[in-house]
């Protein structure tokens, strides 16, 4: 049986919020089977729990932001969610003492390292997957994203930037996640931004925590980071990383084929909402056989609970 996963033990880290630049403390805690992923604002009294669910995504302007009915929010959740998806964590309590998750180095890799350091524990309940049965597509002008039936999880993603430094890199990438590709191929891809946009955001009291330590920064012609890129196609791979995190708001790993062109947080969420609303297009599946093989490769090792 392919089992649900949580952490073996709690683990904490400290970082900086991207938009306000404040120090943020983050703790990841184990959770019982069938809990899901819960963000907990421990800076509030009483604490407020916000589940990672597609219908709670109510702001996608600069990042993915969860907002509950009382207007309590947790922002910049997508990189952490991508790490949880890539490692295959189903259940966790995510404690944070701010309205935004720390940006760390702008990628998912620090969160992957945290999860690996905490250890992965398999639970007694079967892991649920969302299997795509029928195509679902959303469009916004020339941008589009679609989910198609597929045995496993595959992404074909394309971006289209006229910037010379981005045009010189690969703007199309295809990855089949039946191989253990997320940690090696995707997790280290950093967010990126343009100096002219960053200056505007800071004038409006945003992106105050942004720096060369947590983003790839470009001027009109070139990459300004002295250490260059981590992948030749880091720009499109970061957009893929964002999509993985955004789609994990469905609460389960997807078995299907994501194809996307110039998709961002808003379109990713629209696609997930459209999928969940069209009940004939998907189904929950589990793999209960004793020798069942996971259709998506997740990081190992893991220990088994009683």
UniProtKB/Swiss-Prot annotation:
In which pathway is this protein known to take part?
A: Glycolipid biosynthesis; lipid IV(A) biosynthesis; lipid IV(A) from (3R)-3-hydroxytetradecanoyl-[acyl-carrier-protein] and UDP-N-acetyl-alpha-D-glucosamine: step 2/6
Which keywords does UniProt give here? Hydrolase, Lipid A biosynthesis, Lipid biosynthesis, Lipid metabolism, Metal-binding, Zinc
Sorted alphabetically, which InterPro entries does this protein's record hold?
Ribosomal_Su5_D2-typ_SF (IPR020568), UDP-acyl_GlcNac_deAcase (IPR004463), UDP-acyl_GlcNac_deAcase_C (IPR011334), UDP-acyl_N-AcGlcN_deAcase_N (IPR015870)
**Pfam families from the entry?**
LpxC
Q: Which cofactor does it need?
A: Zn(2+)
Q: What is its EC number?
A: 3.5.1.108
Catalysed transformations (reactions): a UDP-3-O-[(3R)-3-hydroxyacyl]-N-acetyl-alpha-D-glucosamine + H2O = a UDP-3-O-[(3R)-3-hydroxyacyl]-alpha-D-glucosamine + acetate
Signal peptide as annotated in the record: none
Q: Which organism is it from?
A: Idiomarina loihiensis (strain ATCC BAA-735 / DSM 15497 / L2-TR)
What are its GO cellular component terms? membrane
| Keyword Heme on entry | no
Binding site residues for Zn(2+): 79, 238, 242
- Any one Gene Ontology biological process term? lipid A biosynthetic process
Task: Provide the family line.
Answer: Belongs to the LpxC family.
List, alphabetically, the SUPFAM superfamilies matched: Ribosomal protein S5 domain 2-like
Name this protein carries in UniProt: UDP-3-O-acyl-N-acetylglucosamine deacetylase
Q: Name one GO molecular function term.
A: UDP-3-O-acyl-N-acetylglucosamine deacetylase activity
Per the UniProt record, the lineage of the source organism begins with: Bacteria, Pseudomonadati, Pseudomonadota, Gammaproteobacteria, Alteromonadales
The active site annotation covers 265 (proton donor)
Role, per record: Catalyzes the hydrolysis of UDP-3-O-myristoyl-N-acetylglucosamine to form UDP-3-O-myristoylglucosamine and acetate, the committed step in lipid A biosynthesis.
Methyltransferase among the record's keywords?
A: no
């Amino acid at each position: 049986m392919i089992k649900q996963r949580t952490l073996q033990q709690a683990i904490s880290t400290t970082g900086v919020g991207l938009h306000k630049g404040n120090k943020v403390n983050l703790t990841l805690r184990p959770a019982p089977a069938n809990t899901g992923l819960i963000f907990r604002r421990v800076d509030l009294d009483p604490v407020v729990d916000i589940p990672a669910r597609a219908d709670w995504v109510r702001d996608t302007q600069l990042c993915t932001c969860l907002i509950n009915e009382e207007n309590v929010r947790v922002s910049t959740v997508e990189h952490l969610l991508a790490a949880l998806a890539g490692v295959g964590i189903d259940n966790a309590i995510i404690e944070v003492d701010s309205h935004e998750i720390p940006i760390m180095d702008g990628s998912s890799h620090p969160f992957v390292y945290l999860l690996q350091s905490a250890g992965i524990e398999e639970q007694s309940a079967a892991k649920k997957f969302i299997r795509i049965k029928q195509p679902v597509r959303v469009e916004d002008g020339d941008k589009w994203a679609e989910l198609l039936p597929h045995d496993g999880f595959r992404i074909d993603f394309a971006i289209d930037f006229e910037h010379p430094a981005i045009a010189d890199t690969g703007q199309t990438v295809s990855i089949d996640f039946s191989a253990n590709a997320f940690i090696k191929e995707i997790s280290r891809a950093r967010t990126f931004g343009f100096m002219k946009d960053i200056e505007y955001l800071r004038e409006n009291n945003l992106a105050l925590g942004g720096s060369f330590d947590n983003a790839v920064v470009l001027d009109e012609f070139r990459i300004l980071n002295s250490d260059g890129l981590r992948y030749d196609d880091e720009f499109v791979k970061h957009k893929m990383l964002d999509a993985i995190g955004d789609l994990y708001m469905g609460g389960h790993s997807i078995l299907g084929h994501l194809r996307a062109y110039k998709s961002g947080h808003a379109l990713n969420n629209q696609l997930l909402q459209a999928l969940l609303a069209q009940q004939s297009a998907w189904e929950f599946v589990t793999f209960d056989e004793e020798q069942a093989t996971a259709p998506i490769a997740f990081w190992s090792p893991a220990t088994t609970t009683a």
